[in-house]
Design a protein with these regions (language model features):
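Conserved nucleotide-cofactor-binding alpha/beta core module
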Residues: 54-170, 174
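Class I SAM-dependent transferase core
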Residues: 1-62, 66, 70-78, 91-107, ...
Length: 191
């Protein structure tokens, strides 16, 4: 694992992204509720997914599900620009306040159905989906750049597979299973 990623992980206070009633649990490696049936992912999984995206400062990333903004901070730290889409306005607004307070100026925010992506700014070199669709979101595949990587959980509630989806120069798409996971369900066209 990249040393800079681990250093950032240890320097970022997860409690900044959690409501007061759960702050004492922020140090635990487990998901925690953030409202509306959504969760902040466990820290080890955030680091794992970020590492598999293979980010650098020239990368443009589409994030589906801003949530608390915790994962967004990792993306913003290691990429050129982040486009993040959140369905729930109050979650998106809180995340934006947190990320603005941390000084991130390379994030663009959108309120809407994340399963549709953000076509106006496509293609993206990397896409991260932080909630699980039941079927592959074709709109997101279409917005993935050639030689791009998408990480997403896929499957029914309670049991999904974390996949790495790659697209080659010719547009051929390949899926690789990374882990068995349990994410909240993605709400939108692909649910």
């Amino acid at each position: 694992m990249d040393e800079k990623l681990l250093q950032f992980f240890h320097s970022l206070d997860r409690s900044l992204f959690i409501d007061n009633r759960y702050k004492t649990l922020a140090h635990l490696d487990r998901p925690l509720p953030i409202g509306h049936g959504q969760t902040i992912s466990q820290p080890s999984l955030v680091v794992y997914m970020t590492a598999h995206l293979q980010l650098d400062k020239t990368t443009r990333v589409l994030e589906i599900g801003t949530g608390s903004g915790y994962q967004t901070a990792f993306l913003a730290e290691f990429s050129q620009e982040v486009y993040t889409v959140e369905l729930r306005g109050d979650l998106g607004a809180k995340a934006r306040q947190r990320l603005d307070a941390l000084g991130y100026g390379n994030i663009r925010y959108k309120l809407g159905d994340g399963s549709l992506g953000w076509a106006e700014h496509a293609p993206y070199e990397r896409i991260l989906v932080t909630a699980a669709p039941k079927r592959m979101p074709e709109d997101l595949i279409g917005q993935l750049a050639p030689e791009g990587i998408m990480i997403l959980p896929l499957g029914p509630p309670g049991y999904q597979q974390l996949l790495m989806v790659t697209k080659d120069k010719q547009g051929e798409v390949t899926q690789t299973k990374l882990l068995d996971v349990a994410f909240v369900e993605l709400v939108g066209k692909y649910t």
